[in-house]
Amino acid sequence: MHYAYPAVFREEPDGVTVTFPDVPEAVTCGATLAEARTRAADALISALSVHVEDNRPIPKPSAARGRELVSVTALEATKLALHDAILAAGITEQVLVRRLGLDEKAVRRLRDPLQLSPIGSLESALRCLGKRVEVSVVDGA
């Protein structure tokens, strides 16, 4: 899945407010459009990490329809994909612990989008769930 979400940037007298229709709890602002864009990515991954923490599915992004897309980082996307794969497989974190031969703390770190993890460890975890990681690079705006 591609974790790029349409954002609404609304200019207001005191700055720019950013909201995400697909992730309503992700809201931020900045004094300038540039600052709002920087904060938007942080607000998005913070809100999505709560979905992981609460064991809820990650919302699917809707079509951009002329709105600017805000993406999570490649590492964050891989962690969100792992979370989605765990939910789709209907397994618990403890089952993944046994399959990977890791301790619970290590698996929790692998799942946490706000923690750094080696990409190889994430690829191994996804392979255990019948998934593989592909990376694509696209032109920037």
Question: For each predicted feature, which ranges?
Answer:
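Short, charged, surface-exposed hinge/linker loops at domain edges
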Residues: 1-4, 39-109, 113-115, 122
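DNA-contacting interfaces and partner/effector-binding or oligomerization modules
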Residues: 1-48
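Broad gene-expression machinery/nucleic-acid interaction feature
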Residues: 4, 15, 69, 130-132
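Residues at or immediately flanking beta-strands
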Residues: 17, 57, 132-134
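Hydrophobic/basic alpha-helical segments enriched in Actinobacteria
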Residues: 23-24, 53-57, 128
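Ser/Thr-centric signal marking residues that sit
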Residues: 28, 32, 92, 121
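DNA major-groove recognition helix of helix-turn-helix/homeodomain DNA-binding modules
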Residues: 120-136
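Short, charged recognition helix plus adjacent turn
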Residues: 137-141
